[in-house]
Amino acid sequence: MSELTPDELALLRGVFDLARAGDADALAWHLDAGVPANLTNGQGDTLLILAAYHEHPDTVRALLERGADVTRTNLRGQNALTSATFKQDVETVRALLEAGADPDAGTPSARATAQHFDLPDMVKLFG
């Protein structure tokens, strides 16, 4: 396995920044050019987890359309649905649920997060 060059590392860091910033078009371009949709940083955060946490539903949808895995968790056991639930981002939660995210997956799960923080509107979304 070859190591990444400084330029390649900078490009990948930039891709994570696009997910955090919600630049769906630029992120989609990079994914279409070959960057993996399930790219993960050193904390285990995927592009999808970061986009969900930073409340970017269009970016979340762009990632889902390109194969991002809704079941992936970071090193703390958190997933994109838990992140969106914590932020009370209804649009992102709906997009993730429509893509098959399980509200009972992860540690803590999205459902447990909603219950812990007394977020009844989020709990209702889980059915």
Which residues are covered by each model-predicted region?
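Intrinsically disordered, low-complexity regulatory segments in ankyrin-centric signaling systems
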Residues: 1-33, 42-45, 127
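Ankyrin repeat start-site detector
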Residues: 10, 42-43, 75-76, 106-109
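Conserved ankyrin/ankyrin-like repeat signature
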Residues: 26, 58-59, 91-92, 121-122
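Ankyrin repeat (ANK) core detector
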Residues: 13-16, 46-50, 79-82, 112
